[in-house]
């Protein structure tokens, strides 16, 4: 846990999933402090919109103003809810919207934590363009190193005149005034042909590797299991290309597409609808934090390309949680398959959780591993 003192309220915050690390990563950053310093209670009129509030620092600080928390991360919503509870704040103080929803009209203040992907930022700025006014105060923040010329140009292109502040604690802010510059329409998704198939893969703004098949997934697809039955999970499904291939290779199986990103799950659904509509009755789509709340001993196999970062921080916390959830939800003799960068040494992590691990394939960058649930020891 970490403490954030600001002009609105003193907060105790923790990351989600919580960890027992000796030196845990902090649940807020200097950009959060810097953004809050710009505001005064007396100037906040109209709806408050907060975008990409990773662990709820801004939402908790401004809870008395009933803010809208907008983003593409279910884990961020869970983190915000947990931190509201931790600080004794009514959860209903914050309203949660995903990025593709309609934003509230005529907001008084918009606070944006600049996301990692420029495509997500553009989608969000275009959505804001429909609701902000020239009187809306628009402030964005990030680490100084993460604000580039392309970031500023995007604000200028979509919303209007843009300036930056001096750096403070290695954070920088962007101030923008809306004046409705001319702007051409943009497609909601980016699409590309998947080589070796007749499929067209559609990707919403925040999907990983949205402009082409990433090399890890490409390697994984060469070693996917075939002729499985029962229920299979594509965990952290992204655009669903792995699950789509599983549907094709395992005609007797049902595939459950799971991701914490609403845009990822929407992309997966769209890709099944457009490429294998006949398999929709063998498909399920779930926005979730890994397999939280899913009954144990349900699945025959889980396949996963786990992330090794959360927001801008390198961490294996999310992957570790995915592995534990997979083991709990697998049937006896059910199998977990993962692809990962070789340097992450997931072999020993899986062996610790499952008691076994087998290397299926390896190259100079990636490894495909399999672990089997042999009993109820955990």
From Swiss-Prot:
Q: Matching Gene3D superfamilies, A to Z?
A: Vaccinia Virus protein VP39
| Location (main, coarse) | cytoplasm
Which InterPro entries is this protein grouped with? DNA_methylase_N6_adenine_CS, rRNA_m2G-MeTrfase_RlmG, RsmC/RlmG, SAM-dependent_MTases_sf, Small_mtfrase_dom
State the top-level EC class: transferase
The compartments listed are: Cytoplasm
- Which controlled-vocabulary keywords does the entry list? Cytoplasm, Methyltransferase, rRNA processing, S-adenosyl-L-methionine, Transferase
Q: Which reaction does it catalyse?
A: guanosine(1835) in 23S rRNA + S-adenosyl-L-methionine = N(2)-methylguanosine(1835) in 23S rRNA + S-adenosyl-L-homocysteine + H(+)
Q: Does the keyword rRNA processing apply?
A: yes
- Cystine bridges: which residues? none
What job does the chain carry out? Specifically methylates the guanine in position 1835 (m2G1835) of 23S rRNA.
Q: What name does this protein carry?
A: Ribosomal RNA large subunit methyltransferase G
What species is this protein from? Shigella sonnei (strain Ss046)
Gene encoding it? rlmG
